[in-house]
């Protein structure tokens, strides 16, 4: 099979440049397009040159549909508004769309689900293999430890430039904990504590958010009991782990029928992992 041709959207950003470098270095994939917003100072530049790997003869442009039409897939770590737009273009082009964008609203999620009728979409709050394995462990722990005996708190820290909170990864881990306890996260989530809050409500899942410096991503799920605590953690040291996970997801999705998938499908933790091609 020929190398999978991938488009990098948001090519001028930190993650976009990481994706360009990662795809260029990995076997089985190649960069065939790079997209930036209209008016970006990066338009017209070579994507490889921008990413520091030399000329790769891929010019950064602002015409996604024409580029998508000549590609096999798109890697997307942009903004909610842009991701919804790219999902529509990917559906028109009938290609793979890997989404690592966080901060999506319910309306955004619905638009992406609609696009998945025509595109093969893999979406996750975190593309790293380690975090997705962690989510499985969190679900198992939450199921095994009774809510009356163990409280669940999720602590996350990211760099000072991150704009959404809690992080998509923290919410992914919260959903895993909620699934383990057979509850709805929306009903039991506690995002803010300030002033006189009263005692902790049993069965809730708390979130604490830290921002500062250049931290790539740190997440801990704390199951706190009487006299003991279990802490399940993941520390991201390099954005490349997210890029490699996204490429793995794209290769997994290639040739599969349209639909909406997660990294748990890619890693073989769900029934969808064996979906017929």
UniProtKB/Swiss-Prot annotation:
An example molecular function term from Gene Ontology annotations: NADP binding
Active site: 158, 162
Binding site for (S)-2,3,4,5-tetrahydrodipicolinate: 159, 168-169
Predominant cellular place of this UniProt entry's protein: cytoplasm
E.C. numbers: 1.17.1.8
Protein location: Cytoplasm
InterPro entries the UniProt entry points to: DapB_C, DapB_N, DapB_N_CS, DHDPR_bac, NAD(P)-bd_dom_sf
CDD domains: DHDPR_N (cd02274)
GO biological process: diaminopimelate biosynthetic process; lysine biosynthetic process via diaminopimelate
Keyword DNA-binding: no
Pathway: Amino-acid biosynthesis; L-lysine biosynthesis via DAP pathway; (S)-tetrahydrodipicolinate from L-aspartate: step 4/4
Signal peptide boundaries: none
A single cellular component GO annotation: cytosol
Catalysis: reaction(s): (S)-2,3,4,5-tetrahydrodipicolinate + NAD(+) + H2O = (2S,4S)-4-hydroxy-2,3,4,5-tetrahydrodipicolinate + NADH + H(+); (S)-2,3,4,5-tetrahydrodipicolinate + NADP(+) + H2O = (2S,4S)-4-hydroxy-2,3,4,5-tetrahydrodipicolinate + NADPH + H(+)
Protein residues bound to NAD(+): 10-15, 36, 100-102, 124-127
Keywords: Amino-acid biosynthesis, Cytoplasm, Diaminopimelate biosynthesis, Lysine biosynthesis, NAD, NADP, Oxidoreductase
Residues that coordinate or bind NADP(+): 37
This protein's record includes keyword Cytoplasm: yes
Enzyme class: oxidoreductase
Domain of life: Bacteria
A Pfam family annotated for this UniProt entry: DapB_N
Family: Belongs to the DapB family.
PANTHER family: 4-HYDROXY-TETRAHYDRODIPICOLINATE REDUCTASE 1, CHLOROPLASTIC-RELATED, DIHYDRODIPICOLINATE REDUCTASE
Function: Catalyzes the conversion of 4-hydroxy-tetrahydrodipicolinate (HTPA) to tetrahydrodipicolinate.
Protein name according to UniProt: 4-hydroxy-tetrahydrodipicolinate reductase
Source organism: Chelativorans sp. (strain BNC1)
